[in-house]
């Protein structure tokens, strides 16, 4: 049996009596007691997540922009100011999603990328292959000397500034999807990004791994609640945010995963997967579902891989959960393209087909329920 990878915060999680699980080969906290309370902390105050299993990768070289113009489906031409971030899919030549990632632009010869934990080695091998094939001459460096803490919620930024006063001046004017580098902190040089995976405001803080436990402890002392993967999943699902490996993978086009907005076909770029996307187009709709109640009660919970039955053919739930914010069973589903918002479809739950309403994503954003 292969030993699990540990983040630099593993001992801190165990000291807090976290319930630990194997998450893609990493020993990670699923909760620290009450998943519901952790979820609510992020929606109403501030919570923090150890996301150090994700991998920071630095790209340096004079042709780094040209490399990303070819490597990813979104357009790095949008990255003009230092610290600007871009969410994109990394595609294979067949148009399938190798990973979803965030690219940060700092200078014309330095970009930084954060990739998912379970795909990191595959991604880096693919980046190296593209670099070599295209003769870009980049240095591609995985930075396992960094850890990442995501601090999320309406009070998250203020609590980060209380904990790291030097970050206030550098990040108080930061717009969403921008990052700043903050030097001179007790926790080393930080990269603080106004990004997240919860549908709330907040920061994702890249910190030297040797200092992350001190940062985590200081944030907790300033009222930021530790949160596990359980709350992270309910929060991201409410926020309409995809999970790689569930909602899309190498067999699924971003156009069939609700990610058409991350694909830029307008610019004349020869990016990997473009030909396949233009040839195949959109073949399925990616929608939100809310399970209907009978006599005030839902007949089950929507879960991944449940069959969806529509007048236009069958589909499948890709992610599902009980929403603490809505008190409803919610899901993402890939369904025939003729299915539209407002339709009622049916989900196979055990031996029953239960009605569910098709809604526009997201379900919840900034503490407000949007789907009805």
Curated annotation (Swiss-Prot):
InterPro entries recorded: GCS_T, GCS_T_bac, GCST_C, GCV_T_N, GcvT/YgfZ/DmdA, GcvT/YgfZ_C, TrmE/GcvT_dom1
Enzyme Commission (EC) number: 2.1.2.10
Pfam families referenced in this protein's UniProt entry, alphabetically: GCV_T (PF01571), GCV_T_C (PF08669)
Transmembrane segments: none
Biological process terms in GO annotation: glycine decarboxylation via glycine cleavage system
Keyword Transferase: yes
Enzyme class: transferase
GO cellular component: cytosol; glycine cleavage complex
Record-linked SUPFAM superfamilies: Aminomethyltransferase beta-barrel domain, Folate-binding domain
Gene3D superfamilies (alphabetical): Aminomethyltransferase beta-barrel domains, Aminomethyltransferase fragment, Probable tRNA modification gtpase trme, domain 1
Reactions performed catalytically: N(6)-[(R)-S(8)-aminomethyldihydrolipoyl]-L-lysyl-[protein] + (6S)-5,6,7,8-tetrahydrofolate = N(6)-[(R)-dihydrolipoyl]-L-lysyl-[protein] + (6R)-5,10-methylene-5,6,7,8-tetrahydrofolate + NH4(+)
Keywords per UniProt: Aminotransferase, Transferase
SUBUNIT field: The glycine cleavage system is composed of four proteins: P, T, L and H.
Functional note: The glycine cleavage system catalyzes the degradation of glycine.
Listed name of the protein: Aminomethyltransferase
